[in-house]
Amino acid sequence: MPNSMSMTIWRRLIVTATAVLAAALLTPAAAHGAPHDSRAPRESRPVYSYADAVRESVWVDTGLDGDGDGRTDRVAADIVRPREPALQGRKVPVIMDASPYYSCCGRGNESQTKTYDAAGHVVQMPLFYDNYFVPRGYAFVGVDLAGTDRSDGCVDVGGRFDVQSARAVIDWLNGRARAYTTRTGTTPAKATWTNGRTGMIGKSWDGTIANGVAATGVKGLKTIVPISSISSWYDYYFAQGAPLYDSGPDWLSDYVESDTARARCAAEQRKIVAGAPRTGDWTPFWTERDYVKDASKVRASVFVVHGMQDLNVRTKNFGQWWDALAKNGVQRKIWLSQTGHVDPFDYRRGAWVDTLHRWFDHELLGYDNGVDREPMADVERHPDQWTTSATWPPRGTAATTLRPAPGSASGVGVLGLRPARGTETFTDDPSLSETDWAARIDRSTPEKAGFVTGPLGRDLRIAGSSEVTVTATPTTATAHLSAVLVDLGPDTIRDYGDVDEGITTLADRTCWGASTAGDSSCYKETAAKTKAVDSTVVSRGWADLGDWAGDGKGRPLTPGKAYTITLDLAATDHVVPKGHRLALIVAGTDKDLIDPPSSTPTLTVDLSRTSAKVPLVGGAPAFARATAGSAGGAVGATAAVTASDAASASAPAAAVESASRGVRHEPAVHRLPAR
């Protein structure tokens, strides 16, 4: 992969010149590098001219009338495709990014927007996808979601208007929907140049649309690559009734809507406000925007990418989506980084482009390049240091029940395997955060209850989604709870709390594909931005205690009455190293991550009815071995391991077995992505 501006520009000039000659001389099969014999390359090659690519726009009829003007809405789809295959009678697959951001806000680390020539044809398409893949025999389609940029309709934030915007384009690519050459005209546009095989990709809202479209089961969608994406919009805005932000989806729709849409979509805005009450109650609005429930409809393979410290689209979103896909036997792959809300192009660029290239070649062109037989998971263990797992979560991972016990001082308890009696009391302090709690873990402070193992005698790996059950008695009618798992010990991590969420943007550029005067393939390089820490929060969960009934409805609490609630903690993959300690902290408001309740409660936690289920590689026996001989957490640990616990660690857990269904197992030797 390229590593300097001068080298990549020179290589790009050579490739562009060679592509024109190659397109004229190569047969269609050879042009795509089809593996017709053992000597054939197993990847698509840049043999088509990007400069001569067809650039066109069509408006696809969605069949919906979101803005109520009496006409069905049309969404704009801007297309860049190689010219030569159509002349050779060949049809090409499509890579699609459907986004609300192409005009208002931009895409990528450099916030690129679409630009157009005087005729309305796209000149600059954001991101590198068209520059890199069009010369390799793919078309790239950038879709403006309904109500944004050049599309009709209204933004409904993950609802049927959003999802149908992209699904209708896939239907058109497969001959099942109508499109036109202009926004209001009647001249039809036909997708005769494509075989209909489509892969969707995108970060954040874009990738969320890919999840939503896949959950419809639309034919022709072969793979999706959701990057830092939402699987259930409720879980973007709320955590079991506790608000994660001080605004709702109506603010987001207003932010991205075009001026034209904003003028005619007031009725839709009112529906959004009414459907998403700030109480945090579950409503039909959220049911429509829950893609997890429709995982059984997914036909496409799924390549999930997420930052494990993403506090924008929090990792519960990928965790529950991944588990649902596994349950339904969907072929899948995953990358997990230490970053926040960051695209892999900006933290592992060379390996990402190589892996994505091979993934699309396999899923859309049908090349047997082995990408499906490589390890399922790539995990960033330290900044720029990656490991792989054959399956994810790894075989032998088991939900292990860890239990809190009183310690030598109030609020400074012990974490182990045996149940214990006693209580701990804390008072919500909205001015303090999870990092404040972790820094005070060994001190008796009024805002939290902490439970800690002794220093570990060996590494302990957490992989998957945890949950914490808390029984608490409040002093007020409202209360919010937080539960976090913390690795206590010095480390150097990506600075995910910084404005750039773990990366630093550099001045040098590298080039990924071909360029034109109006669309450069050269992007600023990045480097890991790191921070030395004494502790790392590895998983988090929050809830409104008023949601204790589990039916999606919050209720006023009765002061003095005990309530039991289970908090869903975010999915992660983290190794607590030998010599560090593992902590569970239970507290109230997590500053800047959830809104505080209307009161300031004091809560008394019943330790005998409080526990954490943590997915440990090796299960309870692994925990017992890691804590054996240490103070606190090791007390009685080995004796508390049951026969079923031991069995779960010595053989693949049922949940882990189901997590690998639908995935081809790897051979003894694997080709790892280029670094």
Q: What name fits each language-model region?
A:
Residues H32-A119, P126-Y129, A139, T198, ...:
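Catalytic-loop region of hydrolases
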Residues R39-S44, Y347-G636, H665-R675:
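C-terminal, loop-rich substrate-recognition/catalytic regions characterized by aromatic stacking residues
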Residues L311-N317:
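Conserved alpha/beta-hydrolase "acid-adjacent" motif
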Residues L325-V342:
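Catalytic histidine neighborhood in serine/cysteine hydrolases
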Residues V298, V304-H306:
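Short beta-strand/loop motif that positions the catalytic acidic residue
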Residues V94, V134-V141, K333:
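A fold-wide structural signal in alpha/beta-hydrolase
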Residues M1-A34, A634, T638-A640:
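Secretory targeting and sorting signals
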Residues R45, L64, G70-D73, G106-R107, ...:
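Accessory cap/linker subdomain of secreted extracellular hydrolases
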